[in-house]
């Protein structure tokens, strides 16, 4: 099935909703979202909605992916850490904008699937790691930008510590049902926080966020 028209309509919608960074728009226009969703969801792949991808997780709606990536204010030489690989879609979009993407997924099955798909599609500047995303990747730090694709009750300390000077971190922070999307920017030893918008994400599970005691089914 040819999704050219659907993908073009998605980009038009992003523009109408205020996404203006041409690099983000181009990256999303070039990334085949339909291959990152289950086969039975492909007819909805370019609609502006989150879709289930298994393991109780979702692929974020296109507008939210675009908004968060635009908020990172990326440069071509940036090294980016993504927390919550999911199906690998956001990492694929990021990889078209920056030099290197590291993405962490705590669910082994999702991580394996994302890694295989990204490798098959030729996203050679993306590395998928299995582990606790709230710990970050200290062996690869610092990062110019960190994108957290799941909601935390607070900003995990290891992620703050792994942010480079002048680095940006975008993360949903709040309770179980609703959160605020925050952007943190490091200047020397100072972190400045901006509130971007209200959001609702699946929970970030890990030692520095929600634990399995809060979400035992996960």
UniProtKB/Swiss-Prot annotation:
Enumerate the active-site residues. Answer: 60
State its location(s): Cytoplasm
Q: Which SUPFAM superfamilies match?
A: S-adenosyl-L-methionine-dependent methyltransferases
Question: Could you tell me the superkingdom of the organism this chain comes from?
Answer: Bacteria
Catalytic reactions of this protein: [protein]-L-isoaspartate + S-adenosyl-L-methionine = [protein]-L-isoaspartate alpha-methyl ester + S-adenosyl-L-homocysteine
GO cellular component terms, alphabetically, are:
cytoplasm
Q: State the similarity comment.
A: Belongs to the methyltransferase superfamily. L-isoaspartyl/D-aspartyl protein methyltransferase family.
Q: What is this protein called?
A: Protein-L-isoaspartate O-methyltransferase
Instruction: Tell me the organism.
Output: Roseiflexus castenholzii (strain DSM 13941 / HLO8)
Q: Which gene encodes it?
A: pcm
């Amino acid at each position: 099935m040819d999704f050219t028209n659907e993908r073009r309509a998605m980009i038009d919608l992003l523009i109408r909703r205020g996404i203006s960074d041409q690099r983000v728009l181009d990256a999303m226009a070039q990334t085949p979202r339909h291959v990152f969703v289950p086969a039975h969801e492909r007819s909805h792949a370019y609609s502006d909605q989150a879709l289930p991808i298994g393991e109780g997780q979702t692929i974020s709606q296109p507008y939210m992916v675009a908004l968060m990536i635009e908020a990172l204010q990326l440069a071509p030489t940036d090294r980016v850490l993504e927390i919550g690989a999911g199906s690998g879609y956001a990492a694929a979009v990021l990889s078209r904008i920056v030099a290197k993407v590291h993405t962490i997924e705590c669910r082994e099955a999702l991580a394996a699937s994302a890694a295989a798909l990204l490798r098959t599609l030729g996203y050679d500047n993306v590395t998928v790691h299995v582990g606790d995303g709230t710990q970050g990747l200290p062996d690869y730090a610092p990062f110019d930008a960190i994108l957290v694709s799941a909601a935390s009750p607070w900003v995990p300390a290891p992620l703050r510590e792994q942010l480079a000077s002048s680095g940006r971190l975008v993360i949903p922070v709040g309770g179980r049902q609703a959160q605020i999307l925050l952007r943190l920017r490091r200047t020397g030893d100072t972190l400045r926080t901006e509130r971007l918008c209200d959001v609702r994400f699946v929970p970030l599970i890990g030692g520095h966020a929600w634990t399995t005691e809060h979400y035992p089914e996960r």
